[in-house]
Regions:
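A positively charged, amphipathic N-terminal helix/segment that binds anionic biomolecules
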Residues: 1-116
Length: 116
């Protein structure tokens, strides 16, 4: 996620910053399908002595959504939903980038005493 350096905002007028902020907010679009985290795939061995996984063919891969807070709360993602989850994660990364830039603009507006 790349947020413009504050020096880039110093060159812009307050009106330009406000217009940029409005444009960024409008570009967020539909945020109902946003996920934050990552998608990981794992393979498993069941431990049964006569299973194919003991011969080097593990079960899976199984997809899991891992929230930002770490391994805790991993959610299984059925194979049919993996493309949907990938799209939602991409939308989440896009939204985070936009929100970071909006926040940086708001910091500059606050420094100018023009936030509002």
């Amino acid at each position: 996620m790349v947020v413009p350096h504050k020096s880039q905002f110093l060159k812009l007028s307050t009106e330009d910053l406000l217009a940029r902020r409005r444009g960024l907010a409008a570009s967020l679009g539909d945020v109902e399908q946003v996920l934050l985290g990552s998608l990981v795939e794992q393979v498993r061995r069941c431990g049964k002595t006569d299973c194919r996984c003991t011969a080097g063919q593990p079960h899976g891969p199984y997809a899991y959504l891992t929230p930002r807070r770490g391994r805790r709360g991993m959610r299984y993602v059925p194979a049919a939903l993996v493309p949907v989850v990938e799209n939602c994660l991409a939308a989440g990364r896009h939204a985070e980038t936009i929100l970071s830039e909006i926040s940086a603009i708001n910091v500059e507006l606050l420094a100018r005493r023009e936030l509002g």
